[in-house]
Amino acid sequence: MTKIKEIKKVLQQEDADAAWITTPLNIFYFTGYRSEPHERLFALLIPSNEEPVLFCPKMEVEEVKQSPFKGKIIGYLDTENPFDKYSKTFSKMLIESEHLTVKRQRELTKAFNIEHYQDVDQSIKDLRNIKSEDEIINIKKAAALADKCIEIGKSFLKEGVEEREVVNHIENEIKKYGVNEMSFDTMVLFGDHAASPHGTPGDRKLQQNEFVLFDLGVVYHHYCSDMTRTIHFGTPNKEAQNIYNIVLKAETEAIKSIKPGVTIKDIDKIARDIIEEAGYGDYFPHRLGHGLGLEEHEYQDISSVNNNQLEAGMVITIEPGIYVPHVAGVRIEDDILVTENGYEILTQYEK
């Protein structure tokens, strides 16, 4: 319940009576219980001076009781109004404005006589930004399993194999290691198809002397990994190899700069300057990276407009890329833990 204590500190700082959390991943973050309730109400109420209250469909109550959550559980039937089961008045409520619908907010106002709302999204992002020891352990395991996925995929490469065949093989084989969920749709792209940064694997067949781009991640105990490797099948042409070398240098130098106190936009600049000086600046169309945790893309953006500083306990990706249509697409991505004195690279597959 340490994380709930942290959000209660936010309530005190903002002079608010309660927080209303409805994003399933944020509810999991604070309670240890995960659910996807679809259209049904699933919400965590955190009053400033009372125990937390979890609203959930009645059919999930026994599951909640088996979870780490310690607080009041309000289960309701589909024919019942869950707000009828809890009577309190809160003058000021913190809400996830990025997630809460207008309809739900009207219901809250009526149920709890709320006079004022304030956004809590950023406060939760700040909490999730710094990982606990347990979270780091899970992300490290997810990263190791992502390494295994690349190994599985590379060993399956052969002339004439289709992109989607490789995807299916990776996802089937990694299940043997206890993986039930990928972080996102696995991407395997051949040759200049990889010049589309978010291309969709299809029936393109692998030919000799092409690059193969793998972008994938694994979920382990709810935590994600996200890595990219670009591997040559045969001998790439001179321009493609040059592009690869530039991207590798950009990633290597950016990672070397990582430590607490470094301004995030400066890391992006290191990689971007290398790519621009090589003449490929127009072919690097995305940010350098992002946060990683319960979601494969989360706070913070590693970008040229982020003036925040790195802190120990953050887990981020570094993923420069160059995408030249009809020539080649190269991206290299690693998961990085910011440590007290520098960094630790969590994804270890060779480059």
From Swiss-Prot:
Its EC number is 3.4.-.-. Binds 2 manganese ions per subunit. Mn(2+) 2 binds at residues 215, 226, 333. Keywords: Hydrolase, Manganese, Metal-binding. Belongs to the peptidase M24B family. Coiled coil: none annotated. Mn(2+) 1 binds at residues 226, 290, 319, 333. One of its GO terms (molecular function) is metal ion binding. It comes from Staphylococcus epidermidis (strain ATCC 35984 / DSM 28319 / BCRC 17069 / CCUG 31568 / BM 3577 / RP62A). Disulfide bonds: none annotated. This is Uncharacterized peptidase SERP1271. It comes from the Bacteria. SUPFAM superfamilies: Creatinase/aminopeptidase (SSF55920), Creatinase/prolidase N-terminal domain (SSF53092). Its cofactor is Mn(2+). The lineage of its organism: Bacteria, Bacillati, Bacillota, Bacilli, Bacillales.
